[in-house]
Design a protein with these regions (language model features):
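Conserved beta-alpha junction segments in alpha/beta enzyme cores
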Residues: 1-94, 102-212
């Protein structure tokens, strides 16, 4: 599901004053200290939904947003649980941590005001995608692998510094061995575009998703 915001909008990810070097005085006056205002869309923000059923039903949502804080995820899980009849404890909400999403959290110190209308739009998308996935469940075989990746990412834009190079890959295939979906777990601070970027984007993980 595409979860692009209505533009223009405030951007989360580089709201500390030390990240304001790219903004003019006029931009700072319009958007507030440290908060960028998105002037366009570089690529789509997505909501990915995976439902696994083996005796019990587990739902995994991954959002292209900066932070999935508890206040937000609790509201989303409750909405999906009530709409789909699912156990709220079996609903997981995570994020890709792009630093170029709309403001969806209250910030590290409660200094931000999240876009509550955007929250509601995401909840509606979650409900729709969960209902669709429940109607289209397929038999699948699961394999779990771990690989080492070098040269494609690290922790922020710091080449040569230590980082976790392990990636776990959960692959679901049909009985004929055809791939259905892959779920990747890796440690990466996706800040490739940096604070100078004024476009909404999924950043590194958007490119990774399109390439896998």
């Amino acid at each position: 599901e595409i979860i692009n915001p209505i533009l223009p909008c405030k951007m989360e990810g580089y709201n500390e004053a030390r990240f304001c070097f790219n903004q003019t005085a006029q931009q700072k006056q319009v958007s507030g200290e440290g908060l960028r205002t998105a002037c366009g869309l570089r690529d789509d923000l997505l909501l990915d939904t995976l439902i696994l059923q083996a005796g019990e039903t587990m739902v995994f949502f991954t959002l292209d947003i900066a932070i999935a804080e508890q206040r937000f995820t609790d509201a989303c899980r409750k909405a999906v649980s009530e709409a789909c009849g699912l156990d709220v404890s079996h609903i997981c909400v995570s994020c890709s941590h792009t630093h170029n999403s709309p403001v969806v959290s209250h910030g590290m110190n409660g200094e931000l005001d999240p876009d509550l209308e955007y929250w509601e739009r995401i909840q509606d998308k979650m409900i729709y995608s969960a209902k669709w996935a429940l109607r289209h469940l397929r038999e699948a075989q699961a394999t779990l692998d771990q690989v080492t990746i070098n040269g494609f990412y690290n922790n922020r834009n710091r080449p040569g510094e230590e980082y976790n190079d392990r990636c776990e890959i959960l692959t679901l295939r049909t009985a004929d061995g055809l791939p259905l979906v892959q779920l990747l777990n890796l440690a990466c601070h996706p800040t490739i575009l940096g604070a100078q970027n004024l476009y909404i984007t999924a950043d590194f993980f958007g490119v990774l998703r399109r390439s896998v």
